[in-house]
Curated annotation (Swiss-Prot):
Subunit structure: The complex is composed of two ATP-binding proteins (MetN), two transmembrane proteins (MetI) and a solute-binding protein (MetQ).
The protein's name in its UniProt record: Methionine import ATP-binding protein MetN
Catalytic activity line of the entry: L-methionine(out) + ATP + H2O = L-methionine(in) + ADP + phosphate + H(+); D-methionine(out) + ATP + H2O = D-methionine(in) + ADP + phosphate + H(+)
SMART domains listed in its UniProt record: AAA, NIL
Gene designation per UniProt: metN
Top-level class of the enzyme under EC nomenclature: translocase
Length: 332
């Protein structure tokens, strides 16, 4: 659906060049929720604005739905943008318009007949759970409700692609979860491709199928969420499990710290007790959790193994064969 090839964006300010994006290559499959994860200043917002050409790249190609959009004429670009919806951190609603009027606005601009506009807006308000708020004004809504209006407005023209620019970062955790659940429902029901930028790990865990990590304007890693967190040494896995570091310091001097990762049915298997019985090692569980990530049940354990070195190595080979993806964490 989206293909970025050698995307580079350089800003010139006070006689200096600031490289916001450097040789970014990215593939977003059709029908996925694809996350761009990075801290402030990583280039996330610049990247998403290059996708719809609100920012024109300095170099590289931007392919959306089979078209290289940097080569389109102004008229062709306007038509292409109608197939891309966008939602924002600060909602960007018209205070003087009702909820109905905000959602109807892009359809009015596009010249839709009034009867068709009413039908479409009512359909979308039902989809986002605001059918009873059609006559309300933005100042009468909560933050989560405002974002739902923004989502409905972005969906109004029937886009193939939805761009989300930190759409949940201004919301509290409970509201964030409900908005992300709505995006997942829209993705499944409409088959809509969603490109979502965020600095929040929980957003990636809850809703993304795939992710790219952006650091200092460069993609340092990309792939399926489950694939990356199951890969020892991956950057995403490291970021997901930074919380294990405090527990990792509570270790026996002769112990070996191992991070284990389980997906699906394997998360319910008693692999640790089986490993202890078979390989004459002791296991001290320092930390553990079971979560829903990318639609799958995911378990992780930080375990301290003690015993003879050869027995521990045999145990680790066994765990790898069982799909537990063991990663030894160095001491110190």
């Amino acid at each position: 659906m989206i293909e970025l090839k050698g995307l580079t964006k350089v800003f010139r300010q006070n006689g200096q060049e600031i490289v916001a994006l450097s040789d970014v290559n990215l593939h977003v499959p059709r029908g996925q929720i694809f996350g761009i994860l990075g801290q402030s200043g990583a280039g996330k917002s610049t990247l998403i604005r290059c996708v719809n050409l609100l920012e024109r790249p300095t170099a590289g190609e931007v392919w959306v739905d089979g078209r290289e959009i940097t080569r389109l004429s102004p008229g062709e670009l306007r038509a292409a943008r109608r197939e891309m919806g966008m939602i924002f951190q600060q909602f960007n609603l018209f205070d003087s318009r009702t909820v109905f009027g905000n959602v109807a606005y892009p359809l009015e601009v596009a010249g839709w007949p009034r009867a068709r506009i009413r039908e479409r807006v009512e359909e979308l308000l039902a989809l986002v759970g605001l059918a009873d708020k059609a006559g309300a004004y933005p100042n009468q809504l909560s933050g989560g409700q405002k974002q739902r209006v923004g989502i409905a407005r972005a969906l109004a023209p029937g886009p193939k692609l939805l761009l989300s620019d930190e759409a949940t970062s201004a919301l509290d955790p409970d509201t964030t979860r409900s908005v992300l659940a709505l995006l997942r429902e829209i993705n499944r029901r409409l088959g809509l491709t969603i490109l979502l930028i965020t600095h929040q790990m929980e957003v990636v865990k809850q809703v993304c199928d795939s992710v790219a990590i952006l650091e200092e304007g460069k993609v340092v890693e990309q792939g399926g969420v489950l694939e990356l967190i199951g890969r020892p040494g991956s950057r995403l896995r490291e970021l997901f499990y930074e919380s294990t570091e405090e527990a990792a310091h509570r270790i026996h001097p002769d112990g070996v710290r191992v991070l284990l990762f389980f997906v699906g049915a394997s998360a319910d298997r008693p692999l640790i007790s089986e490993t202890v019985r078979r390989f004459r090692v002791d296991a001290n569980i320092l930390q553990g959790a079971v979560e829903r990530i990318a639609g799958a049940t995911v378990g992780r354990l930080l375990v301290e193994f003690t015993g003879l070195p050869e027995d521990i190595q045999d145990a680790l080979r066994f765990l790898e064969e069982q799909g537990a993806s063991p990663e030894v964490i160095p001491n110190g």
